[in-house]
């Protein structure tokens, strides 16, 4: 599979790039590796690990048709799901300046910045995100752009909380935009089907505030079934993240708390929410530092500590992330 990808890459560079309308804009690789350590009283473990090796291809087929591919080269390809290692494989048709349709494999659109961030830029997640079956899926989006930087999206795709081969779906309404210059948003309402064919409602509100060198993320997710007694604030997640930028350095911290009341069960005693079962809570937190030696995002060093209230294991990662440009159609355009 990887050999086929590189042959395809060579063909693109040799032939397709010469077409007037059909061309590749960018081809690049990004990767992250780390030295992971964890310890609890009386026990210490450590190992080197490769976290990500991603190949990105972006381009257009015509002036109204654009595409994107992101392939994880270090992820095992499942015979039952041959696109398991493919995050993005989509085609976008911009049929009107304010309207577009996107079809193919893409991110399942759920609000909050913890979900919205590229996985290579996230060092640890909470239970809500960790327990999804899939984060990317084949589906269809219709996007309306009423103004620059404001996108309203309707998405129909497989459900993130059911196996990929199961006929369970998610119906998503998503807004990515801003309220003034200092408040960015990634909000969604998601009507999702779980592996038992029951439906759940997610209201996910991601907010990013800019205060000089400080960026503050505040994410809130409310999860509920129409059948449960208390719809709001009984099954929820609250996540806060802060990044203080000082020259080439980022000082970072993230804290999340997730809770599902014990009363959120059906007549048989089964939890409505299978991601965070009724009667459970989860607290996770950590802090770290990032250093960008060359000043841009193409080289990053990080040191991150994190733990939670369940395993009570201290985790500490030392790592490096780098991006390498293979091809850029316009030298004037940044490739990352």
Per-region residue spans from a language model:
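Outer membrane beta-barrel
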Residues: 21-36, 44-159, 167, 176-179, ...
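Phosphate/oxyanion-binding loops and surfaces in catalytic or ligand/nucleic-acid-binding neighborhoods
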Residues: 14, 149, 327
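Conserved adenosyl
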Residues: 170
């Amino acid at each position: 599979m990887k050999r086929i990808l590189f042959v395809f890459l060579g063909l693109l560079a040799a032939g397709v790039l010469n077409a007037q309308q059909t061309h590749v804009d960018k081809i690049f690789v990004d990767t992250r590796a780390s030295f992971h350590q964890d310890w609890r009283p009386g026990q210490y473990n450590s190992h080197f690990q490769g976290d990500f090796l991603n190949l990105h291809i972006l381009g257009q087929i015509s002036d109204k048709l654009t595409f994107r591919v992101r392939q994880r080269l270090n992820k095992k390809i499942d015979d039952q799901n041959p696109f398991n290692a493919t995050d993005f494989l989509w085609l976008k048709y911009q049929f009107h300046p304010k309207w577009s349709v996107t079809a193919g494999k893409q991110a399942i659109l759920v609000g909050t910045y913890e979900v919205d961030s590229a996985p290579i830029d996230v060092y640890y997640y909470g239970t809500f995100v960790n327990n999804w079956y899939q984060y990317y899926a084949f589906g269809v989006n219709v996007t309306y752009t009423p103004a620059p930087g404001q996108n309203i999206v309707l998405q129909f795709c497989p459900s993130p909380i059911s196996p990929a081969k199961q006929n369970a779906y998610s119906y998503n309404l998503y807004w990515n935009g801003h309220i003034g210059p200092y408040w960015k948003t990634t909000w969604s309402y998601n009507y999702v089907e779980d592996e038992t064919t029951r439906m759940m409602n997610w209201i996910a509100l991601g907010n990013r505030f800019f205060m000089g060198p400080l960026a503050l993320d505040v994410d809130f997710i409310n999860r509920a079934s129409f059948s449960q007694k208390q719809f709001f604030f009984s099954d929820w997640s609250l996540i806060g993240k802060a990044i203080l930028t000082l020259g080439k350095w980022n000082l970072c911290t993230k804290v999340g708390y997730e809770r599902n009341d014990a009363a959120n069960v059906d007549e048989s005693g089964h939890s409505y929410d299978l991601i965070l079962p009724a009667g459970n809570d989860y607290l996770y937190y950590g802090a770290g530092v990032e250093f960008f030696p060359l000043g841009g995002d193409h080289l990053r060093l990080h040191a991150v500590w994190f733990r939670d209230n369940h395993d009570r294991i201290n985790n500490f990662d030392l790592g490096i992330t780098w991006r390498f440009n293979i091809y850029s159609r316009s030298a004037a355009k940044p490739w990352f």
